[in-house]
Each structure stands twice: as C-alpha cells, then as structure tokens.
Amino acid sequence: MLTSGIILLAGSLLSPNPGLIFWTAITFVIVLLILKKIAWGPIIGALEEREKGIQSSIDRAHSAKEESEAILRKNRELLAKADAESDKIIREGKDYADKLRADITEKAQSEAKKMIATAKDEIEQEKRRALDVLRNEVADLAVKGAEKIIKTTLDADMQKKIVDSMIQDLSTKRN
C-alpha cells in the first residue's frame, strides 16, 4: 500500500496541471523582473568590472613582458659592450707589454753595445799605455846596453832620437 501511494504521488507530480503551470510561469516572470531591477545591474556591473580587471591585468602583463624584454635587450647590449671593452683593454695591455718588452730589450742591447764599446776603448787605452811603458823600458834598456857597448853616456836628446827611430823601425817591421 505504501508503494501504491508513492506511485500515485509520483504520477500527480508528473502530470501537467494547467493552473500550476500558469502560476509557476507568472512567478518566474515576476522573479525575473525583480532580479532584473535589483540584481541584474550589479551582476552585469560586477562582471564588467571583473572583465576590466582581467583586461587590465593582461595589459599590465603585456607591458611588463615588453619592459622585461627591453631590459633584457639592454642588458645583452651592455654585456656585449662590456665584453668588447674588456677585449680592447686586454689587447691594449698586451700591446703595451709587447712595446715595453721591445723597449727594454732595445735599451738593454744599446747598453750592452755601449759597454762593449767602452770596454774596447779602455782595452785600447790600456794597450797604448802598456806599449808606451814597454817602449820606455826598451828605450832605457837599449840606452843602457848601448852605453855599455860604447862606454859613453848619451845625452837625453840623443837618446830620444835613437829610441824614436828604433820604435819606428819596430813599428814598420810589425806592420
């Protein structure tokens, strides 16, 4: 019996009742008009405001993206300039070091040549002094030997003439 009551109730709910349909439609229209007057404006306004907020966020995101891309390009340009500048500084440093090395080498070679020339001059001067000393000693020995041989002492001018002629004879014989 309980089951037959449920079936009757379900049947009455599913069967159309024209009065109920009329009043349901009128109630729906009234609620719709009330919602249009009261809630439709704020809902549409909220949706439009939400749309504007979303569009604003999208615009800000696009501008932030463009700005970040511009900053990235600028940073890449600055990095490229810094690389070029560092390469230039390194190249200039190497050039300066090469030039400095060449200058130092040139100065050292020049100093070495000067020292060699000075040493040669000093050797030549010492050689001349030694030859002069040797000539004087040879002249003295020659005079003493000649004195012993001829048993007479020669005066200074005569000795000088004899020594000079002997030295010239020796010089011509050597050359």
UniProtKB/Swiss-Prot annotation:
SS bond partners: none
Top-rank taxon: Bacteria
SUPFAM superfamilies tied to this protein: F1F0 ATP synthase subunit B, membrane domain
Pfam families recorded: ATP-synt_B
Membrane topology: Single-pass membrane protein
GO annotations of cellular component type: plasma membrane; proton-transporting ATP synthase complex
InterPro entries, A to Z: ATP_synth_B-like_membr_sf (IPR028987), ATP_synth_b/b'su_bac/chlpt (IPR002146), ATP_synth_F0_bsu_bac (IPR005864), ATP_synthase_B_chain (IPR050059)
CDD domains referenced in this protein's UniProt entry, alphabetically: ATP-synt_Fo_b (cd06503)
Localization, UniProt: Cell inner membrane
Gene3D superfamilies: F1F0 ATP synthase subunit B, membrane domain
Transmembrane segments annotated in the record for this chain: 20-40
Keyword terms: ATP synthesis, Cell inner membrane, Cell membrane, CF(0), Hydrogen ion transport, Ion transport, Membrane, Transmembrane, Transmembrane helix, Transport
GO molecular function, one term: proton-transporting ATPase activity, rotational mechanism
HAMAP family: ATP_synth_b_bprime
Subunit note: F-type ATPases have 2 components, F(1) - the catalytic core - and F(0) - the membrane proton channel. F(1) has five subunits: alpha(3), beta(3), gamma(1), delta(1), epsilon(1). F(0) has four main subunits: a(1), b(2) and c(10-14). The alpha and beta chains form an alternating ring which encloses part of the gamma chain. F(1) is attached to F(0) by a central stalk formed by the gamma and epsilon chains, while a peripheral stalk is formed by the delta and b chains.
Described function: F(1)F(0) ATP synthase produces ATP from ADP in the presence of a proton or sodium gradient. F-type ATPases consist of two structural domains, F(1) containing the extramembraneous catalytic core and F(0) containing the membrane proton channel, linked together by a central stalk and a peripheral stalk. During catalysis, ATP synthesis in the catalytic domain of F(1) is coupled via a rotary mechanism of the central stalk subunits to proton translocation.
Protein family per UniProt: Belongs to the ATPase B chain family.
Record-given protein name: ATP synthase subunit b
Gene name in the database record: atpF
